[in-house]
A protein has these predicted regions:
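Charged, low-complexity intrinsically disordered terminal segments
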Residues: 1-31, 35-376
Length: 376
């Protein structure tokens, strides 16, 4: 195991975070799972209970793609770049104390016992008996075939100036985004378009392109300060005619059927659908930190069948999982954002952030004043 761009051991993490902002906080945000250079899974999912419906407090809604063929060794090649990079350190070189053999045996025994106990839980039994697991074990899983292209940041991105785009994934995605003709669907848990993004969306809207964004609400986000950065752009986006949807953090019991907890829901999927013919799925959020600071990876799939299914599923489900935002002007000429719930979401209109307290809204208003957008 290796750790990419870790904090140093001779200075406290807090001091490094404060004094090294823009360097020590830059990280590998890539997510991939590749087996024998044959198959690879890409998306936004981390390894943790909350990403697999196993956390009683938080339930991340994520998206993955399983790909086979030439793209698998491409992902392995990207992984090797990071593994062999000068910023990657073996865990043993960072450990303050290496366990002695007896301790290692004890730790392994406890781990094996834990794994054995988990096999009898309702959660594991449900996974093993799920429809997907049964189909996969039987070898009858059907694939949709189409050309795919891996787009990934080079680890050198973290060693060069942030204005140097040579190693940026965005340079590979740019041509696809510049060729949008009719519709752009965006799924991004953290969405901060910035001035460049606003200019891009404005051009699309002037050409009559439909732009729809699904992101987190204040109640569903796990990083309120990032939501504050997004909130600064909502009115401008709505004025342009961009359709904004924010995930409902309290999906009703019908939506949660089959899950083990009534946990808070949060969007974690990162994807784009272009003209219902091209799909991007990966680790990239549309915010400054992902685009400029961190490294990311994803796949561009040129398949009308996949893109159309994806978009149709969104059309069918969005009103039952998210609030639609609207910009209203009152009788005094002041603009107000309202949140509409329909379908399975509460059928009502709200004039404040759904499922939030006064203190949460007040805190978010304060965070919006902080000049830290480049780090969000």
């Amino acid at each position: 195991m290796r750790i990419f761009n870790p904090f140093g051991r001779n200075t406290s993490r807090t001091i490094q975070f404060i004094t090294g902002l823009g360097k020590q906080t830059r990280r590998s945000h890539n997510k991939s799972f590749t087996i024998d250079n044959i198959a690879t899974i890409l998306g936004g999912r981390n390894i943790g209970d909350e990403y697999f419906i196993a956390d009683p407090e938080l339930d991340f809604y994520d998206l993955d793609v399983l790909a086979v063929g030439p793209v698998a060794p491409e992902v392995s090649g990207s992984f090797d770049q990071f593994w062999n990079h000068e910023l990657s350190y073996p865990v043993s070189s960072l450990a303050e104390q290496v366990p002695i053999p007896e301790e290692s045996k004890e730790i392994k025994a406890k781990f094996d016992e834990f794994i054995s106990d988990q096999q009898q839980t309702e959660y594991i039994k449900s996974l093993k008996n799920s429809e997907f697991a049964q189909v996969f074990r039987s070898g009858t899983q059907e694939f949709i075939w189409g050309p795919g292209k891996i787009v990934a940041d080079d680890p050198q991105k973290l060693t060069t100036d942030i204005d140097d785009k040579t190693y940026h994934l965005s340079e590979e995605l740019g041509p696809y985004l510049n060729e949008v003709n009719n519709e752009l669907l965006i799924f991004s848990p953290y969405f901060i378009p910035g001035k460049a993004g606003l200019a891009y969306f404005k051009k699309l809207r002037e050409r009559g392109v439909s732009v729809t964004v699904l992101t987190n609400s204040l109640a569903s986000t796990d990083v309120p300060i990032v939501h504050s950065g997004y909130a600064n752009y909502r009115r401008q986006l709505l004025r342009m005619g961009v359709k904004l949807y924010e995930l409902n953090s309290q999906l009703n019991k019908e939506m949660k059927k089959g899950k083990f907890y009534e946990s808070k829901s949060s969007l974690h999927a990162k994807a784009m659908v272009i003209d219902r013919s091209i799909v991007f799925i990966g680790s990239l959020n549309l915010d400054p930190r992902s685009v400029v600071q961190n490294t990311e990876i994803g796949i561009v799939i040129n398949s009308k069948e996949i893109a159309d299914k994806f978009a149709m599923y969104f059309d069918k489900k969005v009103d039952s999982i998210a609030y639609r935002l609207e910009l209203r002007i009152d009788q005094d000429g002041f603009e107000h954002i309202v949140w509409h719930g329909s379908g399975d979401v509460e059928d009502r209109t709200l004039y404040w952030e759904p499922h939030t307290s006064f203190w949460e809204r007040f805190s978010m208003g304060f965070l919006r004043l902080m000049p830290a957008e480049s780090q969000l």
